[in-house]
């Protein structure tokens, strides 16, 4: 595995570059913009290691981040747009700015990205921009998405009971096997088609 030494390339712009089996663990990548970069080696089926890296305000656009290790990163303000991130591990990632021990806010923009089989277990992504992503088989046990925009998403093989999705925008999403009897949907936004479909699963016919 190739390691960065010294582990700092913050506030840089990197385009159309390839990083196979690279170790960015602990690196300061804050404010760095990656466009059209490859971080996944298809031959070895391995992604890059970003664990414990500072990715505050970092931007990934049109990148392949499949199987990347994002555990325990500082990800406040991160942008991941139009990327492939299948199988990536975000456990322990912090998207929070702690103001006091009881007051915080989250900031993240993960949009138009394939998050199939990624691991977001126990991650807090409240009031974030998370729209038009693919969530097939994504691990979300104990995750909190409360108040986030999850609209336009694809949620096949998604365990709705495992995560907090209260007050989320789910309009225009494919909701997979969502059963409203076992999920707290307080404050959730649904469009009329979704609402009628969910009620039909309970044997309730919606007229008009």
List each model region and its residues:
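Tandem repeat scaffolds
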Residues: 1-208
């Amino acid at each position: 595995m190739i390691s960065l030494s010294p582990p700092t390339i913050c506030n840089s712009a990197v385009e159309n570059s390839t990083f196979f089996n690279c170790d960015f663990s602990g690196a300061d990548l804050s404010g760095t913009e990656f466009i059209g970069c490859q971080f996944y080696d298809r031959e070895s089926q391995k992604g890059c290691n970003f664990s414990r890296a500072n990715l505050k305000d970092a931007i990934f656009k049109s990148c392949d981040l499949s199987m990347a290790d994002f555990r325990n990163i500082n990800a406040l303000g991160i942008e991941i747009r139009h990327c492939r991130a299948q199988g990536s591990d975000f456990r322990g990632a912090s998207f929070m700015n702690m103001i006091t021990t009881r007051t915080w806010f989250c900031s993240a923009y993960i949009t138009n990205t394939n998050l199939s089989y990624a691991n977001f277990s126990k991650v807090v992504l409240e009031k974030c921009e998370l729209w038009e992503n693919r969530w097939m088989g994504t691990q979300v046990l104990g995750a909190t998405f409360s108040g986030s925009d999850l609209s336009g998403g694809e949620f096949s093989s998604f365990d709705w009971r495992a995560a907090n999705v209260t007050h989320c925008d789910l309009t225009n999403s494919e909701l997979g096997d969502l059963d409203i009897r076992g999920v707290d949907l307080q404050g959730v936004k649904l469009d009329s088609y979704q609402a009628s479909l969910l009620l039909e699963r309970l044997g309730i016919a919606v007229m008009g």
